[in-house]
Amino acid sequence: MAASDLESKAKEAFVDDDFELAAELYTQAIDAGPATADLYADRAQAHIKLGNYTEAVADANKAIGLDPTMHKAYYRKGAACIKLEEYQTAKAALELGSSYAPGDSRFTRLLKECDECIAEESSQAPAKNVEAPVAATVEDKEDVANMDNTPPVVEPPSKPKYRHDYYNSATEVVLTIYAKGVPADSVVIDFGDQMLSVSIEVPGEEPYHFQPRLFSKIIPEKCKYQVLSTKVEIRLAKAEQVTWTTLDYSGRPKAIPQKISTPAETAPRPSYPSSKSKKDWDKLEAEVKKEEKEEKLEGDAALNKFFRDIYKDADEDMRRAMDKSFRESNGTVLSTNWKDVGSKTVEASPPDGMELKKWEI
């Protein structure tokens, strides 16, 4: 098979969230030759999705070697280096890449993240020496008389700070918490209808708790997680096929639809325990539903609810048609006729007066 055909199939696999297949097809395309900068840069992105950050950096470097002005190669090198906590290397790559793509907000966002991580590392280093000047004050004879009445200076226990990020697929949100070397039995994760509770309690360390109200509803019984050597990966099964623009409900736009009917709403569920205390998830979800009931949908929200209701009552072919047409057209076409769209690629059709632009990642 020609390299161009393999590259096309690799792109299709990536769009379908089959990142392992995408990486393998890019490898076959590179072996078939010629090995282009685009192939290495795109395989780097597949490696990032798979968590193979060292391989991603290697591929990005090969792409840069073939095309020193390819901004997406620098971007992917920077993104992978951040995951490896190589912040200075990431910053250098992102700064150079942004010079070839001025105005690209993605570089601005990652550079800001880099600066924050570098500042955090810098602030942690001198903190260990804070006790030295405090101890030296004992030598001051004028203060010796007051030492008996001075409470001892106690250094606060170190609190683990785990970074996290997430990405969307059509059916789930994958949340990654970067907690290295955490024993599996120290991790307790509970799922609610629109709630997530993560507790990590390592002996001798301050407990870590992360309990957001989620951007949208999930299906608790389909959610799962895995504790790995460098991270905790949590897969949240979406109850409705919308793109999460943030992880937490507090950051979601007002226009995003809220209400959705699922079998899980009518079936009684037990309260989900956490590692510290028992939480009544049903009570929390009742409060969420009360807020949703009081919300008045209008504009885009009302339209989204209309389409969601169609999807809810549709048969399997109608749902397949809606999913395929919406995904392949970048959200510009929604068809319920599987016979019409099942055997062809649905072309994008932006509204009158608007121009379709591809966003390169």
Curated annotation (Swiss-Prot):
- Residues where Phosphothreonine is found: T150, T262
Q: Which GO terms describe its cellular component?
A: cytoplasm; nucleus
Q: Where is the composition biased (Basic and acidic residues)?
A: 277-295
Give the residues annotated as coiled coil.
none
Highest taxon of the lineage: Eukaryota
Its job: May act as positive regulator of basal defense. May be involved in basal disease resistance to the fungal pathogen Ustilago maydis.
Please give the name of this protein: Protein SGT1 homolog
Give the classification, highest ranks: Eukaryota, Viridiplantae, Streptophyta, Embryophyta, Tracheophyta
Q: Which gene encodes it?
A: SGT1
